[in-house]
Structures are given as C-alpha cells and as structure tokens.
C-alpha cells in the first residue's frame, strides 16, 4: 500500500513539472515569435548650401550665401503670413500655395515608381501635398534628375474624383475628361504647377534599414509647370497635417534633426517618418491652423534674464491673426516689433563697449556687429525661447547670431518688415542641434538636444 502511494505521488510530481514547463513556454512569447520593430522611413536632408546640394557653389562668398538666405527668409515670412490668415483666394480651392522659388532650404532624395526613379524634393512643413514633375510635359522646368514618367511605372495609378483621397474642390474643375482628380499649386510669384492626383510606390534608402518601400502614397503628378523653380529640384515634399500629406499616410509622426547648416560638409541632417520615429525629449502642445504648425511661445530669456515682454504678443488672437509658427523653410526667426525691441536692446546693452556696431547692406534694420562669432562672442549668453509645458528651446551663439560677411555677424532673430506685423516664426537656425519630432495625432512636438549622428544607428 505504501509503495502504491509513493508511486502515485511520484507520477503526480512528474505531471506537475511537465505541466509547469509547458505553461512557462506558452507564457513566454519571445520563445515562439519575434517582436516586430515599429516601421520607420529615413532620408537624408540636404541643405541648400551643402556640398551635396545641386545648388552648391564652392566659389560663393559668405555674403552671397547669406544674402540669398536672408532674402529667402523674408519671402518665406510673407508666405507664412498670407497662409496664416488664409489670405489667398484661388479658383481651385484645393490648391495650396507654396513659397516662391528662392525659399528652398532643405531637400530630400527618394525614389518614385517601379522601377524606382530618384527625385530631389524641397522639404516644406508649410504645405501639404507631395508633388513631382511628370512626363509628358505641357511645360516643365529644368531639374537635376530625370523627370518621372508614370507610363513606365507598374505601380502608378490615377485617382478618380470619387476617391476619398481626392482633394476637395469646386465641382466645376476638380475632374479631367476621364474623371481623374486634378490639382493646382499656385505660387507667390504667379507661377503654378498643375496635374493629376495619383498614387505611387515610394522607396526610401537608409543606411540602417536598407530599402524601405511605401505603397500607394498619394502625390501630385505635375505636367504643366510654369517657371516654378529655376532648375534642380523635382517638386515639393509637403509635410503639413492634411489628410493627403505623406506624414498622415505614414502614421502621423515625423521628425527632423538639423546640425550645423553653415558647415557645407555636415552629413547627418535627416528626416524620419512612421511609427518608428524617435519621439523623445521635452514636450510642448501643438496647434494646427490653416495647415501650419503653431506653438505657444510664453517668453524669451537672454542668459539668465527673462525679458520683459508681454506673452500676449506671441499668441494667436480669436480672430485668427498672430501666434507663433515653427517652420523649416526660413533660416531666421521673426518676432513682433515690441518683442524684438526688448531683445535687441538687451543684446546692445551687453555688447556696448565690446563690439562695434555696423550696418548690413542687405538688411539695414538688422542688429549687426563687426567681428566673428567664435572670436568676439566668447562668453556671450545664449537666448532661450520658453514654450508651453516647460520646454526651453536654447539658442547658443551660433543659433542666435548669423555670420553675414567675412568680418560681420547679425542677430538671427529679426522683426518682420512692415507696420503692424503680428506673426512670430521659429526658423531653422533656432532648431539647430535638436531632433524635433511631431506627433500629429497627440498634437505634441518634442525637442531633444542631440548630435544628429547619434540617430543614425
């Protein structure tokens, strides 16, 4: 009897151990499946003045480079101001208005179609549609890459007017004779790009993930383009928050990391889309108006001193004017006159007796000094843009000032030209050395101070 009981206990123990082992295996999914990393799509960003840019001129002087940049920033501000107030009235209400041709700051290179055809696009957070020039051309401008021919792509599809992705327009002209969805992009200088809305396969080539395809991306195939750009780029990569934007297609998250824009050999600027976008850092609320990105700027400091500026001058009014836009298409930042007067007065007070004031021929209203930033601004305090949520966007001396000549530099925060301007803009110099990430679904922007090279692995 005792032997039988002992045998029963032994068998029960074996059964328990086998069952426990099976449960442990079942409870550990890592032993039966591989965790899938969130997908991300990465492309290098090429600055207009980079050695990798088709616009690069090794013989250009500092004055040539900065003169273009300042004129471009002024043109871009005019565009943002008009877009922020919805000031454009066009026959085609689907049409966005993109900045004039001089305002190409960053470009991205990826491929369209199957087989893939490389295209170079200007990045723009202030417009929504991704578009490229397409054959056959009624009119096309010069570009560095071959013009995309949709007839040679096995993955190109036009969109019918009834498609949810067809941009809303007036019933009279949203369709062509074949019931395909049309688009029209108008420019500040009166030129335009027009064609069909379609879908196509895009291919990103990344150093860490190889070739990453995106199927059925909505884009504009532009066949009729009147002097839109004076030659190199293929079109525009709109990163605005609309339903047809590539950002929405890839999960409503994207980020860009910008290092030194004045180092022509800096190779680590990059743009990332998708759920695998690096979303880290200090967080501030994001507001969307007229398909521009607005932040809540609460104040400005110079060094440890909070400047006496009324925060109301940075906020958007109930009538839809003013506010603070964050943008990638302007090099400089702009603040309204009352804020600029306080900031420039404080800079002058610190520089008085140390730096020699000079007048810049291109921007006579700018605050400029004789000397070099590295030599003459040793120990000069940086500035901080204080954003809602406790986020401090720090501008060191290379972001607060811009080299404008062989022996001259100017304050890179300026006031808009014209009386009564109430829009503020945070430009790309202020975003140097940050990874700036947008989560459109959560309506948040993340700022992480980082060396962009660290994001490549």
Label each PLM-derived region with a short phrase:
Residues 118, 232, 321:
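Conserved catalytic motifs of the protein kinase core domain
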Residues 132-133, 141-143, 248, 336, ...:
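Intrinsically disordered, low-complexity regions enriched in proline, serine, glycine
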Residues 131-133, 235-242, 246, 335, ...:
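Short beta-strand-centered segments at strand-helix junctions
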Residues 196-207, 211-304, 324:
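Eukaryotic endomembrane system proteins
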Residues 2-121, 129-196, 216, 268-270, ...:
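Disordered propeptide/prodomain
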Residues 127-130, 137-139, 225-226, 244, ...:
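Solvent-exposed loop/turn segments at secondary-structure junctions
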Residues 2-53, 57-59, 113-115, 123-128, ...:
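Aspartic protease catalytic domain
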Residues 193, 247-249, 315-317:
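Extracellular/lumenal carbohydrate-interaction signature centered on repeated Trp-anchored short motifs
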């Amino acid at each position: 009897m005792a032997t039988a009981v002992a045998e029963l206990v032994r068998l029960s123990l074996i059964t328990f151990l086998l069952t426990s082992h099976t449960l442990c295996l079942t409870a550990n999914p890592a032993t039966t499946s591989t965790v899938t990393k969130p997908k991300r799509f990465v492309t290098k960003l090429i600055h207009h003045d980079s050695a990798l840019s088709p616009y690069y001129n090794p013989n250009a002087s500092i004055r040539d480079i900065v003169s273009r940049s300042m004129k471009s920033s002024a043109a871009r501000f005019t565009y943002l101001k008009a877009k922020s107030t919805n000031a454009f009235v066009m026959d085609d209400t689907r049409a966005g208005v993109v900045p004039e041709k001089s305002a190409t700051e960053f470009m991205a290179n990826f491929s369209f179609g199957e087989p893939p055809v490389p295209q170079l696009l200007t990045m723009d957070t202030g417009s929504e549609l991704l578009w490229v020039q397409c054959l056959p051309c009624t009119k096309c401008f010069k570009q560095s890459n071959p013009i995309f021919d949709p007839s040679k792509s096995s993955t190109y599809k036009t969109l019918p007017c009834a498609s949810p992705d067809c941009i809303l327009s007036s019933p009279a002209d949203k369709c062509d004779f074949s019931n395909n969805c049309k688009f029209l992009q108008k420019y500040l200088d009166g030129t335009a790009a027009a064609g069909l809305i379609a879908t196509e396969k895009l291919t990103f080539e990344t150093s860490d993930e190889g070739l990453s395809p995106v199927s059925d991306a909505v884009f504009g195939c532009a066949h009729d383009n009147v002097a839109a750009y004076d030659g190199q780029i293929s079109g525009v990569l709109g990163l605005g928050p609309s339903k047809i934007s590539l950002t929405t297609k890839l999960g409503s998250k994207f980020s860009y990391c910008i290092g030194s824009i004045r180092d022509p050999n800096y190779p680590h600027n990059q743009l990332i889309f998708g759920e695998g976008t690096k979303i880290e850092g200090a967080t501030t609320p994001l507001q969307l108006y007229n398909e521009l990105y607005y932040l809540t700027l609460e104040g400005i400091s110079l060094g440890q001193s909070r400047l006496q500026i009324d925060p109301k001058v940075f906020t958007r009014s109930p009538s839809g004017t003013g506010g603070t836009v964050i943008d990638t298409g302007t090099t400089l930042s702009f603040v309204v006159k009352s804020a600029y007067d306080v900031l420039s007065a404080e800079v002058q007070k610190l520089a008085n007796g140390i730096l020699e004031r000079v007048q810049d021929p291109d921007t006579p209203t700018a605050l400029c000094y004789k000397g070099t930033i590295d030599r003459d601004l040793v120990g000069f305090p940086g500035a901080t843009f204080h954003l809602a949520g406790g986020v401090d966007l720090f501008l060191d001396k290379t972001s607060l000032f811009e080299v404008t000549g062989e022996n001259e530099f100017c304050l890179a925060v300026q006031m808009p030209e014209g009386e009564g301007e109430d829009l503020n803009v945070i430009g790309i110099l202020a975003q140097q050395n940050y990874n700036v990430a947008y989560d459109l679904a959560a309506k948040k922007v993340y700022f992480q101070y980082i060396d962009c090279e660290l994001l490549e692995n």
